[in-house]
C-alpha cells in the first residue's frame, strides 16, 4: 500500500466517522457524547456542519478519530479473556467514562 492509498483510506475513514458522529448526535445526544468522548461544543459544531464541510474536513491526511485506550487497564480489559462478557463491558464503560472529553484546541 503506497502513501496515496493510505491517504485515501484515511479520508474515507474520516468521512464515515464524521457521518456516523452526526447521526449518533442527532439520534441520542447524551449517548453520543459518551460514546464519542467529545465535548458539547464539538458536538454543536459537528451537528451544524453541512455535507460539503464534512467532506472537506474528512479530506485531511490525518485521522480525525483516535483510540481511547490510553490507559493500560482499558487495553487489558479488551485483550484479556473474561468469562463474564457483561461484566467486562461494564468495567470498560466505567473506565472510559472517567476519561476527559476531547476539547477543541
Swiss-Prot record:
Gene Ontology MF: a single term: DNA binding
GO-annotated biological processes: bacterial-type flagellum assembly; positive regulation of DNA-templated transcription; regulation of bacterial-type flagellum assembly
Organism: Ralstonia pickettii (strain 12J)
Keywords, ordered alphabetically: Activator, Bacterial flagellum biogenesis, Cytoplasm, Disulfide bond, DNA-binding, Transcription, Transcription regulation
Protein known as: Flagellar transcriptional regulator FlhD
NCBIfam families documented for this protein: PRK02909.1-1
Record flagged with keyword Zinc: no
Function: Functions in complex with FlhC as a master transcriptional regulator that regulates transcription of several flagellar and non-flagellar operons by binding to their promoter region. Activates expression of class 2 flagellar genes, including fliA, which is a flagellum-specific sigma factor that turns on the class 3 genes. Also regulates genes whose products function in a variety of physiological pathways.
Cellular localization per UniProt: Cytoplasm
Lineage: Bacteria, Pseudomonadati, Pseudomonadota, Betaproteobacteria, Burkholderiales
One GO cellular component, as annotated: cytoplasm
